[in-house]
């Protein structure tokens, strides 16, 4: 078994799908998205310093941390929601940055994008991709 990687921060890219093509690009299927940041540490908090939401064209739609950083306690989860009515597109994404005061386990960062309708439910699970790390 490989040893756990211990780091003090990351910048992550996380795709979400607020609209997906349905019927060969003629109709868009609207979806909502839940983004979850799970602190996998047993004793150390992490701090979310950036949670930016971009549309398919790379333009910022929302800054979820306008009021300041968020502390995520050990084994706790913080989540963000993109409503069903959002029209940011199939290529929408988040940039998420977190830091810690010491070397810690990396968090689990995921999005669940879904549309639940009778006889036509769609759900997509995505995980964050590391862009930059801090040791």
Kindly give the residue locations of the regions a language model identified.
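Transition segment at domain starts
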Residues: 1-26, 119-135
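Short, solvent-exposed loop/turn segments enriched in Ser/Thr/Gly
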Residues: 27-34
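Hydrophobic beta-strand positions
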Residues: 37, 52-53
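Asparagine-centered strand-capping/turn motif at beta-strand->loop junctions
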Residues: 37-44
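Short, hydrophobic/aromatic beta-strand segments
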Residues: 44-51, 62-64, 106-110
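Intrinsically disordered, low-complexity Pro/Gly/Ser/Thr-rich segments with frequent PxxP/GP/PP motifs
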Residues: 55-95
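Terminal connector regions
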Residues: 85-135
């Amino acid at each position: 078994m490989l040893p756990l990687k211990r780091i003090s921060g990351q910048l992550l890219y996380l795709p979400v799908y607020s609209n997906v093509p349905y019927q060969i690009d003629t109709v868009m299927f609207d979806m909502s998205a839940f983004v979850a940041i799970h602190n996998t540490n047993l004793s150390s908090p992490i701090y979310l310093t950036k949670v930016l939401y971009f549309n398919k064209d790379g333009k910022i739609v929302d800054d979820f941390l306008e009021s300041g950083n968020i502390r995520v306690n050990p084994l706790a989860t913080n989540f963000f929601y993109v409503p069903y009515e959002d029209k940011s597109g199939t290529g929408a994404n988040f940039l998420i940055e977190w830091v810690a005061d010491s070397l810690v386990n990396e968090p689990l960062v995921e999005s669940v994008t879904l549309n639940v309708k009778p006889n036509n439910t769609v759900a997509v699970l995505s995980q964050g991709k590391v862009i930059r790390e801090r040791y």
